[in-house]
């Protein structure tokens, strides 16, 4: 019985890892905490146009990311959303650490227009701006994160 249970647990962990529950197949670069990577990918008061803004993300991941959303607000404002009531994450219903913003913020959506680009310096994006609410997943900070915020955003789940 024990070997079967142990094998089942390993299979479950592998399945969770591949399905993205434990993280994305396009994981964050190792030098960043989840909160730091969230900030790089999703928080910018005045992001440049998408093609320029996405270069930083694509250089770290060594690929053209299909799409990305920048919240035009401060990291501190997103941290404050982590204090809103917990909700089930709309895009991953197994997670219950999401929080919805109380206010709409300006967003910049970036969509890759040339998915066949062989070189990351050739990634091109279409820009779309709008104002929306957003939902973020939050976790306790990593020891490498600033002690200023005990709970930090780690994932942009959706915009509403």
Swiss-Prot record:
Pfam family, one: RnaseA
Gene (name only): RNASE3
Protein name (database record): Eosinophil cationic protein
Organism of provenance: Pongo pygmaeus
GO biological process, one term: defense response to Gram-positive bacterium
Cited CDD domains: RNase_A_canonical
Residues forming the catalytic site: 42 (proton acceptor), 155 (proton donor)
UniProt KW Cell inner membrane keyword: no
Assigned GO CC terms: extracellular space
Disulfide bridge partners, by residue number: 50-110, 64-123, 82-138, 89-98
3'-nitrotyrosine, modified sites: 60
Signal peptide: 1-27
Keyword list, A-Z: Disulfide bond, Endonuclease, Glycoprotein, Hydrolase, Nitration, Nuclease, Secreted, Signal
